[in-house]
Protein backbone atom coordinates (compact mmCIF):
# COMPACT_ATOMS: atom_id res chain seq x y z
CA UNK A 1 0.00 0.00 0.00
CA UNK A 2 1.72 6.56 -3.16
CA UNK A 3 0.33 11.41 -10.87
CA UNK A 4 -3.30 12.15 -9.99
CA UNK A 5 -2.99 15.88 -9.96
CA UNK A 6 -2.93 10.39 -8.45
CA UNK A 7 -1.84 8.51 -8.24
CA UNK A 8 -1.71 4.38 -4.15
CA UNK A 9 1.79 -0.82 -4.59
CA UNK A 10 3.99 1.00 -7.70
CA UNK A 11 1.20 0.90 -4.99
CA UNK A 12 -1.53 1.38 -2.29
CA UNK A 13 -4.47 2.49 -4.09
CA UNK A 14 -3.04 0.91 -1.39
CA UNK A 15 -3.14 3.51 -3.79
CA UNK A 16 -0.38 1.13 -4.05
CA UNK A 17 1.24 1.84 -8.37
CA UNK A 18 3.67 -0.30 -10.58
CA UNK A 19 4.72 -0.03 -14.19
CA UNK A 20 7.84 -0.83 -16.13
CA UNK A 21 6.66 0.13 -19.54
CA UNK A 22 9.75 -0.23 -21.64
CA UNK A 23 12.55 -2.65 -22.25
CA UNK A 24 14.83 0.29 -21.65
CA UNK A 25 13.68 0.55 -18.04
CA UNK A 26 14.36 -3.15 -17.50
CA UNK A 27 17.76 -2.83 -19.12
CA UNK A 28 18.58 0.07 -16.84
CA UNK A 29 17.64 -2.05 -13.84
CA UNK A 30 19.88 -4.87 -15.05
CA UNK A 31 22.77 -2.47 -15.55
CA UNK A 32 22.28 -1.21 -12.03
CA UNK A 33 22.49 -4.73 -10.66
CA UNK A 34 25.79 -5.26 -12.44
CA UNK A 35 27.36 -1.99 -11.27
CA UNK A 36 30.02 -2.18 -8.54
CA UNK A 37 28.92 -1.13 -5.08
CA UNK A 38 30.69 1.96 -3.79
CA UNK A 39 30.37 3.50 -0.37
CA UNK A 40 28.62 6.86 -0.41
CA UNK A 41 28.27 9.51 2.23
CA UNK A 42 24.58 10.39 2.12
CA UNK A 43 24.09 14.03 3.04
CA UNK A 44 21.37 14.90 0.53
CA UNK A 45 18.73 12.53 -0.84
CA UNK A 46 16.24 13.22 -3.63
CA UNK A 47 12.86 11.59 -3.02
CA UNK A 48 10.21 11.28 -5.75
CA UNK A 49 6.52 11.39 -4.82
CA UNK A 50 3.57 11.67 -7.14
CA UNK A 51 2.06 14.66 -5.42
CA UNK A 52 -1.42 13.58 -6.45
CA UNK A 53 -2.42 10.61 -4.32
CA UNK A 54 -4.14 12.27 -1.40
CA UNK A 55 -3.96 11.77 1.50
CA UNK A 56 -0.72 9.80 1.03
CA UNK A 57 0.86 12.69 -0.87
CA UNK A 58 -0.61 15.76 -2.51
CA UNK A 59 0.36 19.09 -3.99
CA UNK A 60 -0.67 22.00 -1.78
CA UNK A 61 -1.50 25.51 -3.02
CA UNK A 62 1.80 27.11 -3.91
CA UNK A 63 3.29 23.82 -5.11
CA UNK A 64 4.55 22.40 -1.82
CA UNK A 65 4.07 18.66 -1.24
CA UNK A 66 2.02 17.61 1.77
CA UNK A 67 0.22 14.59 3.17
CA UNK A 68 1.02 11.51 5.22
CA UNK A 69 4.16 10.53 3.34
CA UNK A 70 5.84 13.96 3.13
CA UNK A 71 5.31 14.46 6.88
CA UNK A 72 6.62 10.98 7.66
CA UNK A 73 9.56 11.57 5.34
CA UNK A 74 10.48 14.78 7.14
CA UNK A 75 10.43 12.89 10.42
CA UNK A 76 12.61 9.96 9.33
CA UNK A 77 15.06 12.17 7.44
CA UNK A 78 15.51 14.20 10.60
CA UNK A 79 16.29 11.04 12.53
CA UNK A 80 19.09 10.04 10.14
CA UNK A 81 20.31 13.63 9.72
CA UNK A 82 19.96 13.63 5.94
CA UNK A 83 18.56 16.49 3.88
CA UNK A 84 15.68 15.04 1.86
CA UNK A 85 14.55 17.02 -1.18
CA UNK A 86 11.08 16.06 -2.40
CA UNK A 87 10.20 16.28 -6.09
CA UNK A 88 6.90 15.56 -7.85
CA UNK A 89 7.03 12.88 -10.53
CA UNK A 90 4.31 11.07 -12.46
CA UNK A 91 4.16 7.39 -11.58
CA UNK A 92 5.18 6.11 -14.99
CA UNK A 93 8.50 7.94 -14.82
CA UNK A 94 9.46 6.94 -11.29
CA UNK A 95 11.26 3.64 -11.89
CA UNK A 96 13.24 4.84 -14.93
CA UNK A 97 14.12 8.04 -13.07
CA UNK A 98 15.35 6.11 -10.04
CA UNK A 99 17.51 3.79 -12.15
CA UNK A 100 18.92 6.73 -14.11
CA UNK A 101 19.98 8.48 -10.91
CA UNK A 102 17.44 11.29 -11.14
CA UNK A 103 16.07 10.24 -7.74
CA UNK A 104 17.50 8.28 -4.83
CA UNK A 105 14.26 7.12 -3.22
CA UNK A 106 10.64 6.57 -4.31
CA UNK A 107 7.81 7.17 -1.84
CA UNK A 108 4.36 6.80 -3.34
CA UNK A 109 2.29 4.28 -1.38
CA UNK A 110 4.29 1.58 -3.15
CA UNK A 111 3.21 -1.94 -2.22
CA UNK A 112 6.10 -4.33 -1.63
CA UNK A 113 5.74 -7.36 -3.91
CA UNK A 114 8.10 -10.17 -4.99
CA UNK A 115 7.94 -8.96 -8.59
CA UNK A 116 9.07 -5.47 -7.64
CA UNK A 117 11.77 -6.82 -5.37
CA UNK A 118 13.45 -8.35 -8.41
CA UNK A 119 14.67 -4.91 -9.50
CA UNK A 120 14.30 -2.70 -6.41
CA UNK A 121 15.29 -2.67 -2.77
CA UNK A 122 12.50 -1.87 -0.33
CA UNK A 123 12.57 -0.48 3.16
CA UNK A 124 10.65 -2.17 5.91
CA UNK A 125 6.95 -1.32 5.47
CA UNK A 126 5.68 1.84 7.12
CA UNK A 127 1.99 1.17 6.37
CA UNK A 128 -0.36 -1.64 5.38
CA UNK A 129 -3.87 -0.96 4.09
CA UNK A 130 -6.76 -2.83 2.43
CA UNK A 131 -8.48 -1.92 -0.84
CA UNK A 132 -12.12 -1.46 -1.79
CA UNK A 133 -14.54 -1.01 -4.64
CA UNK A 134 -16.38 2.29 -5.00
CA UNK A 135 -19.63 2.95 -6.87
CA UNK A 136 -22.24 5.63 -7.31
CA UNK A 137 -25.06 3.08 -7.66
CA UNK A 138 -25.32 0.69 -4.71
CA UNK A 139 -27.57 -1.59 -6.76
CA UNK A 140 -24.36 -2.81 -8.39
CA UNK A 141 -22.50 -3.54 -5.15
CA UNK A 142 -24.13 -2.80 -1.78
CA UNK A 143 -22.66 -0.07 0.38
CA UNK A 144 -19.84 -1.22 2.63
CA UNK A 145 -20.84 -2.13 6.18
CA UNK A 146 -19.39 0.47 8.60
CA UNK A 147 -16.66 -0.97 10.79
CA UNK A 148 -16.59 -4.34 9.06
CA UNK A 149 -13.15 -5.99 9.14
CA UNK A 150 -11.28 -6.55 5.91
CA UNK A 151 -11.61 -9.89 4.15
CA UNK A 152 -8.15 -11.39 3.81
CA UNK A 153 -7.16 -12.50 0.33
CA UNK A 154 -4.18 -14.83 0.04
CA UNK A 155 -3.45 -14.54 -3.67
CA UNK A 156 -4.35 -18.22 -4.09
CA UNK A 157 -7.20 -18.47 -6.60
CA UNK A 158 -8.87 -21.41 -4.85
CA UNK A 159 -8.69 -19.91 -1.38
CA UNK A 160 -9.97 -16.53 -2.57
CA UNK A 161 -12.67 -17.96 -4.84
CA UNK A 162 -15.73 -17.44 -2.57
CA UNK A 163 -15.05 -13.73 -2.11
CA UNK A 164 -14.07 -13.11 -5.72
CA UNK A 165 -16.99 -15.12 -7.14
CA UNK A 166 -19.51 -13.03 -5.18
CA UNK A 167 -18.00 -9.86 -6.64
CA UNK A 168 -17.89 -11.36 -10.13
CA UNK A 169 -21.65 -11.93 -10.02
CA UNK A 170 -22.23 -8.31 -9.05
CA UNK A 171 -19.85 -6.88 -11.66
CA UNK A 172 -20.72 -9.10 -14.61
CA UNK A 173 -21.25 -6.94 -17.69
CA UNK A 174 -20.12 -3.78 -15.90
CA UNK A 175 -17.18 -1.44 -16.55
CA UNK A 176 -14.50 -1.25 -13.86
CA UNK A 177 -12.01 1.61 -13.67
CA UNK A 178 -8.50 1.10 -12.31
CA UNK A 179 -5.31 3.15 -12.29
CA UNK A 180 -2.50 1.73 -14.41
CA UNK A 181 0.53 0.02 -12.97
CA UNK A 182 -0.67 -0.60 -9.42
CA UNK A 183 -0.74 -3.80 -7.42
CA UNK A 184 -4.52 -3.60 -7.81
CA UNK A 185 -4.37 -3.50 -11.61
CA UNK A 186 -3.25 -7.12 -11.84
CA UNK A 187 -5.92 -8.27 -9.37
CA UNK A 188 -8.71 -6.58 -11.32
CA UNK A 189 -7.48 -7.93 -14.66
CA UNK A 190 -6.94 -11.46 -13.35
CA UNK A 191 -10.26 -11.62 -11.52
CA UNK A 192 -12.73 -9.71 -13.73
CA UNK A 193 -11.51 -9.14 -17.29
CA UNK A 194 -13.44 -12.15 -18.62
CA UNK A 195 -16.80 -10.93 -17.26
CA UNK A 196 -16.43 -7.13 -17.21
CA UNK A 197 -14.84 -4.33 -19.21
CA UNK A 198 -11.68 -2.95 -17.62
CA UNK A 199 -10.83 0.70 -18.24
CA UNK A 200 -7.32 1.78 -17.24
CA UNK A 201 -6.48 5.35 -16.20
CA UNK A 202 -3.21 7.19 -15.78
CA UNK A 203 -4.40 8.71 -12.51
CA UNK A 204 -7.00 7.91 -9.88
CA UNK A 205 -8.66 11.36 -10.05
CA UNK A 206 -9.23 10.90 -13.79
CA UNK A 207 -10.93 7.59 -13.05
CA UNK A 208 -13.04 9.16 -10.32
CA UNK A 209 -14.29 11.81 -12.75
CA UNK A 210 -15.55 9.05 -15.03
CA UNK A 211 -17.16 7.22 -12.11
CA UNK A 212 -19.09 10.32 -11.08
CA UNK A 213 -20.06 10.99 -14.70
CA UNK A 214 -21.38 7.44 -15.13
CA UNK A 215 -18.84 6.42 -17.76
CA UNK A 216 -17.75 3.51 -15.57
CA UNK A 217 -19.76 1.50 -13.05
CA UNK A 218 -17.18 0.81 -10.35
CA UNK A 219 -13.61 1.60 -9.41
CA UNK A 220 -11.04 -0.08 -7.18
CA UNK A 221 -8.39 1.57 -5.01
CA UNK A 222 -6.88 1.84 -1.56
CA UNK A 223 -9.36 2.35 1.29
CA UNK A 224 -7.35 5.26 2.65
CA UNK A 225 -7.37 6.99 -0.73
CA UNK A 226 -11.15 6.81 -0.99
CA UNK A 227 -11.79 7.59 2.66
CA UNK A 228 -10.24 11.00 2.06
CA UNK A 229 -11.39 11.67 -1.48
CA UNK A 230 -15.09 10.85 -1.12
CA UNK A 231 -15.28 13.80 1.28
CA UNK A 232 -14.61 16.17 -1.61
CA UNK A 233 -17.67 17.95 -2.95
CA UNK A 234 -17.12 16.69 -6.48
CA UNK A 235 -17.05 13.08 -5.21
CA UNK A 236 -20.14 13.31 -3.01
CA UNK A 237 -21.95 10.63 -5.03
CA UNK A 238 -19.18 8.03 -4.55
CA UNK A 239 -19.65 5.41 -1.83
CA UNK A 240 -17.44 2.55 -0.69
CA UNK A 241 -19.01 -0.75 -1.70
CA UNK A 242 -18.64 -4.39 -0.77
CA UNK A 243 -16.03 -5.81 1.58
CA UNK A 244 -12.65 -4.27 2.23
CA UNK A 245 -10.05 -6.58 0.72
CA UNK A 246 -6.75 -6.99 2.52
CA UNK A 247 -4.29 -9.70 3.41
CA UNK A 248 -1.16 -11.26 1.89
CA UNK A 249 -2.32 -10.67 -1.69
CA UNK A 250 -1.06 -7.07 -1.44
CA UNK A 251 2.25 -8.01 0.18
CA UNK A 252 3.59 -6.88 3.57
CA UNK A 253 2.65 -3.24 3.04
CA UNK A 254 3.96 0.01 1.58
CA UNK A 255 7.64 0.86 1.67
CA UNK A 256 10.29 3.14 0.24
CA UNK A 257 11.99 1.95 -2.96
CA UNK A 258 15.74 2.18 -3.61
CA UNK A 259 18.24 1.12 -6.25
CA UNK A 260 19.69 -2.34 -5.63
CA UNK A 261 23.17 -1.00 -4.90
CA UNK A 262 21.97 1.46 -2.24
CA UNK A 263 21.64 -1.02 0.62
CA UNK A 264 23.46 1.39 2.93
CA UNK A 265 20.81 4.06 2.35
CA UNK A 266 18.02 1.53 2.84
CA UNK A 267 19.56 0.51 6.18
CA UNK A 268 19.48 4.12 7.40
CA UNK A 269 15.81 4.50 6.50
CA UNK A 270 14.92 1.09 7.96
CA UNK A 271 16.28 2.16 11.33
CA UNK A 272 14.43 5.49 11.21
CA UNK A 273 11.14 3.90 10.15
CA UNK A 274 11.47 1.35 12.94
CA UNK A 275 11.94 4.14 15.46
CA UNK A 276 8.96 6.07 14.06
CA UNK A 277 6.79 2.97 14.37
CA UNK A 278 8.01 2.24 17.88
CA UNK A 279 7.41 5.71 19.32
CA UNK A 280 3.96 6.14 17.78
CA UNK A 281 4.90 8.72 15.14
CA UNK A 282 3.49 6.67 12.27
CA UNK A 283 0.22 6.05 14.12
CA UNK A 284 -0.10 9.74 14.97
CA UNK A 285 0.37 10.77 11.34
CA UNK A 286 -1.98 8.01 10.15
CA UNK A 287 -4.69 9.17 12.52
CA UNK A 288 -4.22 12.72 11.23
CA UNK A 289 -4.36 11.90 7.52
CA UNK A 290 -6.32 8.64 7.30
CA UNK A 291 -8.46 8.79 10.46
CA UNK A 292 -7.33 5.23 11.14
CA UNK A 293 -4.22 3.32 12.17
CA UNK A 294 -2.32 1.87 9.19
CA UNK A 295 0.78 0.67 11.01
CA UNK A 296 1.94 -2.70 9.63
Please give the residue ranges for each predicted region.
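Bacterial N-terminal signal peptides that target proteins for export
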Residues: 4-24
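Sec/Tat signal peptide C-region and signal peptidase I cleavage site
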Residues: 33-39
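Extracytoplasmic small-molecule ligand-binding "clamshell" domains
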Residues: 40-110, 118, 279, 292
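Periplasmic-binding protein-like
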Residues: 51, 128-132, 223-224, 230-270, ...
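Ligand-binding cleft/hinge of the Venus flytrap
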Residues: 57-60, 73-81, 142-174, 179-202, ...
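Extended ligand-binding regions for polar small-molecule ligands
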Residues: 70-80, 136-158, 162, 175, ...
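Short helices/loops that flank or line small-molecule/ion binding pockets
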Residues: 74-79, 87-88, 92-106, 119-121, ...
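Acidic, polar ligand-binding/catalytic clefts
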Residues: 78, 83-168, 237-249
